[in-house]
């Protein structure tokens, strides 16, 4: 593996896991590396997780660099469209 940096950030949200059950997400783990499933040489990988519940309590996403940048732009656009008082 050739992970360049692993960035862990606290999160407060929910994720829908396998079987359709929802769980509280407390951590985001972001890193650029070889994917497990995506058909690309390298991907930006994001794990939405709750470490205290074990390794199964996570949703993993593998995105191409272009898709990751598009997602960043979409998140920024969505947040910017809401009133500042709502987004802090």
What label would you give each PLM region?
Residues 1-88:
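Positively charged, low-complexity terminal tracts
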């Amino acid at each position: 593996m050739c992970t360049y940096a692993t960035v862990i950030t606290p999160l407060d949200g929910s994720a829908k896991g396998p079987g359709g059950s929802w769980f509280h997400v407390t951590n985001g783990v972001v890193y650029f590396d070889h994917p497990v499933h995506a058909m690309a040489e390298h991907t930006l990988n994001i794990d939405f997780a709750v470490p205290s519940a074990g390794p199964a309590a996570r949703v993993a996403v593998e995105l191409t660099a272009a898709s990751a940048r598009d997602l960043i732009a979409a998140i920024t656009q969505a947040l910017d469209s809401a009133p500042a008082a709502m987004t802090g």
